[in-house]
């Protein structure tokens, strides 16, 4: 059962202190408004004390406050005041916790069993910058940030349509992370929207810190080598997918948006395809397909050719392979597996290590691979 706020200001302050466990960043200040005892509560770093004081003092100096009791003061601040802080009522501690951790300020008045939250958010966030994982030659240089509302504005600025819809959900019993669902009401299939709403409303996760946490719960289920959910950190690409009838899911704290559904061929698309001529974009896409199938099939095809149909190989290459087989104790199949395994290790090291060390590892690996290719006659 939810704990309701009390008429006693002291009891409400003690309940909030107990709720947040005497956290040092939880700020409370006793003030007097029209001779009535009040208290403001906020989290340092999430709310702006300066903005709150400027707005309240400016309004108090401009407006005559003619109130005689706590209920009158509460109703005046809620409905009659010109304070531009979007005041909203709060009746229980769980609501107060949700609003406070979102960066708002809670105003408590002695003698009133309700609180008043005001929009004083002042969170520090990374500015909009160029995405590092999705480069392009032409087009926008903007990337998503970690703040959900900023990401909403980036999409809304690109898709200025009356059919663009943005819905929010809350996931994670411990983190209470806000999730945004963006779609075009005229283009997105209703069946897809019903499925996404049902799954986002009932996520069995105690913690949600990134959009990747949602991926296993949004797919159709069953085994598949390729995911049916894509990701992007570019607002223009997310806007393009929305205009194609897909849904985009954003998570507060993550610069990566999820795109549902995601088809296999979309892994080979880029934003440059939209700004290039059709035949040139198709040619580049065919090159990507060819590179993918070569990387996947060539090692196995080479092992099969050497082991079962060596007459398909050029004699010079066959002689070098035979000489290399004599010098190594492992069969060609195991050699190929070891090489692929080492390549994955080098790739992970280049990605996860600090940039200074990762670049050095990648350079050394490239030199070793190049030297091995020359010695093999390739």
What are these regions (language model features)?
Residues 249, 256, 262-378:
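Transmembrane alpha-helical segments that form the functional core of multipass membrane systems
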Residues 1-297, 311-315:
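Membrane-embedded alpha-helical signal segments
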